[in-house]
């Protein structure tokens, strides 16, 4: 559904494109609201597993995707800054489930209607 949004960067001092191909893929936290919406819309339209990705940097981000309908999530860009990001996301989800007494993560999938 979404990998990146096409973006452009201009070097104002050289008055030229800062990216060799003029445009490039913008990913990470900037695309998360779009990605969450797309997961939600897909989950409403089909009954197949959906992997939520795009801007997940912590457990709260991952939980947004799960509540929107993702059956799994993927951590991408955050791994560049923190090689433990995926582990921390998983631990954060476990903490959330304990805090809110959720026994089965499937109870969270698509819980936002």
Tell where the protein language model's regions lie, with residue ranges:
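Short, well-ordered coil/turn segments that N-cap beta-strands
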Residues: 46-50, 70-71
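A short, charged, Gly/Pro-tolerant segment at domain boundaries
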Residues: 107-113
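Glycine/Thr-rich beta-alpha phosphate-binding loop at enzyme active sites
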Residues: 1-44, 48
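C-terminal helical cap(s) of enzyme catalytic domains, especially alpha/beta-barrels
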Residues: 10-24, 66, 78-103
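Glycine-rich phosphate-binding active-site loops on the catalytic face of alpha/beta enzymes
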Residues: 1-8, 55-56, 60-88
